[in-house]
């Protein structure tokens, strides 16, 4: 009898039922990054490009808005290379600074002191512990010639500030 039942189950192909059901969801970021003021380089001498206003430059201002306290950190870097430029045959030395320029709440007054640096100092990381808006200035100076003060070739130069919200 057992052999007959086994034989019938093999012939009839007993199968099990299976269903796979997806569960979908979307998460909307509660942190946004916007350019509040576009930056541009002034050229105070042949070998320097700078965003400093005293040299006819404009420091870019980045605004980061978060509606959820302590859920994000801001990660902002001044440029360390040109994204487009004439051909450069020598070294460009980059310096810069990222700083809190303005906040929507006095509770954010400790952001600069609480920040840390990475990427050789070019990147500054800010824990966003208070919901609201924070404006960051991102100064940048490019010096051509590796200390030899060589003139930049004529042409158009572009460098990119990187700013992002990172979920914690």
Identify the meaning behind each predicted range.
Residues 2-8, 48, 119-124:
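Terminal low-complexity, poorly structured segments
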Residues 18-93, 97, 124-168:
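N-terminal small/polar-rich segments of proteins
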Residues 1-19:
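Gram-negative bacterial Sec-dependent N-terminal signal peptides
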């Amino acid at each position: 009898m057992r052999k007959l039942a086994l034989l019938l189950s093999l012939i009839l192909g007993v199968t099990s039922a299976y269903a796979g059901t997806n569960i979908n969801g979307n998460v909307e970021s509660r942190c946004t990054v916007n350019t509040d003021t576009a930056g541009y380089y002034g050229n105070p001498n042949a070998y320097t490009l700078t965003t400093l206003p005293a040299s006819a430059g404009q420091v870019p201002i980045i605004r980061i808005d978060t509606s959820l306290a302590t859920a994000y950190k801001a990660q902002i870097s001044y440029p360390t290379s040109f994204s487009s430029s004439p051909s450069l045959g020598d070294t460009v030395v980059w310096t810069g600074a990222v700083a809190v320029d303005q906040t929507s709440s006095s509770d954010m007054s400790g952001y600069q002191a609480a920040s840390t640096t990475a990427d050789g100092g070019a990147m500054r990381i800010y824990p966003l512990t208070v919901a609201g808006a924070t404006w960051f200035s991102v100064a940048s100076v490019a010096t051509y010639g590796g200390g030899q003060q060589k003139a930049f070739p004529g042409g158009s130069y572009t460098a990119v500030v990187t700013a992002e919200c990172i979920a914690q």
